[in-house]
Design a protein with these regions (language model features):
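ATP/NTP phosphate-donor binding region
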Residues: 1-91
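Noncatalytic linker/hinge segments flanking ATPase motor cores
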Residues: 6, 58, 77-85, 103-111, ...
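Short glycine- and Lys/Arg-enriched binding-loop motifs that mark or flank ligand-binding interfaces
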Residues: 14, 37, 92-94, 100, ...
């Protein structure tokens, strides 16, 4: 017997998707603080920075926009941790693809910050998992971070 595909809806707690999702940033994020730093890939930062600025207005202070360093590595995370604007933020906004988002997630864990992900490509699951994958600077696998 052949079964037709069924439509199933899954709701992830803390997951917002859709054309108006940026309009919900303030409501979703302000319970976690008033200052956010944005970490991401250079192209992703260029694509999303103005949209994030408009969405948060004066409700969330953006302490800075910083490239993640091109590799989700412990070395890049240590470098980001040394930036005063990162240390002063209450939250981390991780913008981009998988490695940029993983960098933001592990940075948040290392600095005891809440993070929010803003995927700019559809092919990454990094935005909806707690797993972060770290690499050595040469791109070889280093470890998984949970």
């Amino acid at each position: 017997m052949r079964r037709e595909h069924e439509m199933i809806t899954h709701n992830f707690p803390g997951y917002t998707i859709g054309p108006d999702s940026y309009e919900e940033i303030v409501e979703i994020c302000t319970p976690f603080g008033k200052k956010a730093v944005v970490i991401g890939g250079e192209r992703a930062l260029n694509a999303a920075s103005e949209k994030i600025r408009r969405a948060v207005g004066s409700s969330i202070q953006l302490t800075g926009f910083f490239p993640y360093g091109g590799e989700a590595s412990a070395e890049n995370i240590e470098s980001l941790k040394s930036i005063p604007e990162v240390r002063e933020a209450d939250m981390i906004f991780a913008v981009g693809g998988g490695k940029a988002i993983d960098t933001g997630k592990v940075l948040a864990q290392a600095t005891d910050r809440t993070y929010f992900t803003f995927p700019t490509i559809a092919s990454t699951c990094a935005s909806c998992t707690s797993l972060g994958i770290l690499y050595h600077p040469d791109g070889s696998l280093r470890e998984y971070s949970f």
